[in-house]
Amino acid sequence: MNRIFHISLACLLLAGGISGAAYADPVTINITGNVIAAPCVVDGTSSINVDLGDIPASDLAAVDAATPWKAFSMSVKNCPAGTTKVTASFSGTPAPDAPDYRYINTGTATGISIALAKDTDTNLGNGATWAVNVDSSRSATWPMRTRIVASNGKATPGTVKAVVVATLTYQ
């Protein structure tokens, strides 16, 4: 009888230890993610080169003198079903003379900056955004134009170069 009591007591102690383990701290598992609109395909290459041609420095001899606008466009195609809008966010180095709406020339010509605008004359400076609806052919297009503007009326000959990055988000 004494032996049965010891075995029973040992079983109770073991069971108590096991049941204590059953009351350990809980662990929370967080599972996250996003269901997103899939990207469209850039129509053409991922770089758009706009050649403004040869401009005489004398055409930029007055403050805010500008070259004629040069039209171009950026497009995406094959947008997945359910993608209804694409927003382009523009970024680049702002021009010191007009940081809200022109970009700095990183070429060798001095006294100039580069303007970028919608085809409707709305400026597309650093930080600008432009949302375009996806059409029935599952494409979206941003018609734009660019030109050189004289910053100080003392443009010097040289190369013209500006880099503007358009980051696309899909809805």
Question: What are these regions, as identified by a protein language model?
Answer:
Residues 9-17:
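Bacterial N-terminal signal peptides
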